[in-house]
Amino acid sequence: MCIRDSSRTPTSVAGTLFVDNWRWEGVPFRILTGKKMPYGCVEVVIKLKAPPLKLYEGEINDRIVIRLQPNPHLDIRMDIKSPGLDDNLELATLTHDYPQDRAVDGYEKLLFDAINCDQSHFVHADEVMESWRIVDDLLCTGDKCKIRTVPYIYTGGWGPQHKVDFITDWDYPA
């Protein structure tokens, strides 16, 4: 990939956002995006809190994974006690794959909604303004910037090493 030295177009972003309302207070929303990544997908991973009482040794990795694109599906992943006398945990996954013949292209749904005057899937003005506020912070240069950007040379994979180190801390399910 050839990018001019003068380019200020972000090609790789990893960050944590917080929603400023009572419902989502303190809940991190982690964003990972970039060009030429190993694979493209849109998914939501909800990592459930560990119970306050730890009955068994090992990590608790209970989570709900909602894949929107490609191949929409839902995974509920939880650590359960293995059968037998020991106190080992094993990962159990409940998966639901949505039939591909019922899948609808995103633009089909938007056109259908537009024809039926349903605005619920369209971005509202306040969402657009907030998106631009975040992007403007990413494009900021100088000492007054709220977000630190790091120049890097693209070498493939998930992006520069500092991005890989950053997302490793997310405990993202493979």
What is the role of each PLM region?
Residues 4-174:
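Secretory/organelle targeting and membrane-embedding segments
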